[in-house]
């Protein structure tokens, strides 16, 4: 029974706001999982557009990739793994270097486990 609840919980992990084009975390409690919380670290989110890392732009792109490439309800769910990865990278505006980041890969593995 617990597994069913976890699956229901994870199925509702993301919300897509079609008006803004933003992917949002529907269940912020998921950030209690260290692999997901690590993605939001301000230091790793610093970029040209967000020098202080407060807007978590990198984490947003990473969560977008996780949804598009791994989530069972992704629009790319029926694609072959390689094609799904390429489309998710493109749509998430991520580089291969960002994809290979150990913290991000750990979050992907954790999402698959859940």
Predicted segments, located by residue:
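N-terminal, charge-rich alpha-helical recognition modules
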Residues: 1-113
């Amino acid at each position: 029974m617990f597994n069913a609840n976890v699956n229901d919980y994870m199925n509702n992990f993301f919300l897509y706001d079609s008006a803004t084009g933003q992917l949002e975390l529907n269940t912020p409690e998921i950030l209690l999982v260290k692999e997901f919380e690590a993605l939001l670290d301000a230091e790793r989110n610093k970029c040209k557009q967000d020098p202080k890392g407060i807007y978590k732009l990198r984490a947003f792109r990473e969560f977008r990739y996780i949804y598009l490439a791994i989530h069972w309800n992704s629009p790319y769910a029926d694609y072959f793994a390689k094609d799904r990865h390429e489309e998710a990278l493109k749509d998430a505006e991520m580089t291969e270097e960002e994809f290979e980041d150990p913290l991000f890969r750990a979050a992907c593995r954790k999402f698959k486990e859940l």
